[in-house]
Amino acid sequence: DLDKSGVIDPGEFKVDDHGDLSIIGNQQARYRFGINLAANWNGIGLSVFLQGVGKRDWYPGSDAGYFWGKYGRPFFSFIPAIHDYTDDMYDPEKNNWDTAYWPRITSYQSNGTNNWTKVLEVPNTRYIQNAAYVRVKNIQVDYSFNRNVCDKLHLQGLKLYLTAENPFCYTPLHKYAPNFDPEGLSYDTDFASAAQGYTYPILKTFTFGINVTF
């Protein structure tokens, strides 16, 4: 009861009458960074490019099925391993109300009609996700053969390399939203944009090649 009115409600959804609603989180990406690392030793080369965002909050859209799972629409039960509900879901037999992250399973709790009758339809601090991340955008390992080998092969230069694009991404987001890519998140401003998490993730690419100089 933030407004001390004795009733928990959203007021008139206006700036001057917002009831118990308050601003939570910040979905803007802050502290963007990039790091280039490179090293060479005895013909062996290694280069790594890291990129990421130091701070960003994200709240799942009301119809983000890959986050809410069965708490949204019941047919999401056909999609395996959305969540492991066994330990983090409230169970009256375990009486784990103080440690469970998820409430008791009931369908259509996240995608309500904005009338405050559903448990999960009102954004709250409990389910704000940490969408900061660091991604290995590019990593390359190469080996340049020495002059003796090149001379025997009548070459000016010979190098083997293996390159990986987007091979790894670390983000706290994947604790409860493993199917989401932090770079592909959108903003849930209305129900038209609420169905999040259905875009293809950034692809991983691996390339092996040979550079030959005659």
Task: Identify the role of each PLM range.
Residues 43-47, 148-149:
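Repeated loop/turn-to-beta-strand initiation elements of outer-membrane beta-barrel proteins
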Residues 34-36, 138-142, 207-209:
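Membrane-embedded beta-strand positions in outer-membrane beta-barrel channels/transporters
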Residues 55-159:
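Extracytoplasmic gating/loop element in the C-terminal half of outer-membrane beta-barrel translocons
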Residues 31-33, 42-44, 132, 154-158, ...:
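Outer-envelope beta-barrel architecture signal
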Residues 5, 9:
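Acidic carboxylate motifs that coordinate Ca2+ or other divalent cations, activating on Asp/Glu
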